[in-house]
Amino acid sequence: MEKVLVFGHKNPDTDAICSAIAYAELKKELGMNAEPVRLGEISGETQFALDSFKVEGPRFVETVANEVDNVILVDHNERQQSANDIESVRVLEVIDHHRIANFETSDPIYYRCEPVGCTATILNKMYKENGVTIRKEVAGLMLSAIISDSLLFKSPTCTEQDVAAARELAEIAGVDADSYGLEMLKAGADLSGKTMEQLISLDAKEFQMGNAKVEIAQVNAVDTNDVLVHQAELEKVITTVVEEKGLDLFLFVVTDILTNDSVGLAIGKATNVVEKAYNVTLQNNTATLKGVVSRKKQIVPVLTETFQA
C-alpha cells in the first residue's frame, strides 16, 4: 500500500507535531499506510510532551515529493507554511483550525476546518466518529496540543469544545490537565541555550496580507525581559531575515504566560501598520500589546485588516 505523509506547518508548534502523530495513528487504524513527519525542529515544549508520554518524535523532512505522491496536512493550509515542494504532490486531506488562504487543489479533497482553538480538538471528534479508541500516549499528546494552543485555556481562541476535549483526554492520559499543563508551558518558556536565530524561528509563520509579505514569530516567557535583554542581537538577525525574504514586516511577539500580555518587536518598512492596528507608538521598535496572546485571533486578522484598509 502506498505511503501517505502527514505533517503540520514549518517551524512546528506542539499542535503541528502532536496532531500529525495523532492523525497518522487514526488513519493507520482505518487502513491507510500513514506516517507522521515534521518540517522543522521540535521545540522544548513539544519535547517535554513527547518525553512525558514516552513517544518518539516524527522524523524531519524538507521535501515530500521524493518519497510520496499523496500527503495530508494538519494545523495549516497556506502553501508558504507547508513543505517546500507541496505543489508537486496531491493533498488528500486538510484538518485545520486557521484561516484559509493561498490554498487550492486540482482535485476535490476532504477538508475539515473548524473555528476551535486546536487541531487536536477536531481529531478528538474524529476518533469518536470513527469508533477508534485513543491510546493513552496519544491522548496525552493531543491534550498537550490543546494546552499549548490555548495557553492552558486562557487564550481567546479557546472554546468550550477545547476545554471539554482536554478534560476527556486528560482522563484517558491519566494526568491532571492544569498541573501538567503548567509544567509543559514552563518547559516551553525556558529559552536558555537558544540562539537568536532559533528564538525568531521557533514558532514563526509567514503570511500574505494584501500586497504585504509578513512574518510573525512568537515565543512564550515567564518574564518578557528575559528575552528582550537581547533586543539588539534579535534586531540584527530579524533584519537579516527581512532582507533575505523581502519581507515588509517581521513582528516578533514575546508573550508572558503569567500576565497574558505580550511585547511586540517590529522590524521592516511597514512597522507603522503595527502602530495603527493596535493604537500604540513603537518606542525603540517595541510596544506592549495588552491582553494579546493569540497570533491566530488577535494578530493575523488585525494586521491583515489594517494592511488592506
From Swiss-Prot:
The keyword ATP-binding does not apply. InterPro entries: DDH_dom, DHH_sf, DHHA2, DHHA2_dom_sf, Mn-dep_inorganic_PyrPase. The keyword Nucleotide-binding does not apply. It is found in: Cytoplasm. Mn(2+) 1 binds at residues 9, 13, 75. HAMAP family: PPase_C. This is Probable manganese-dependent inorganic pyrophosphatase. It comes from Bacillus mycoides (strain KBAB4) (Bacillus weihenstephanensis).
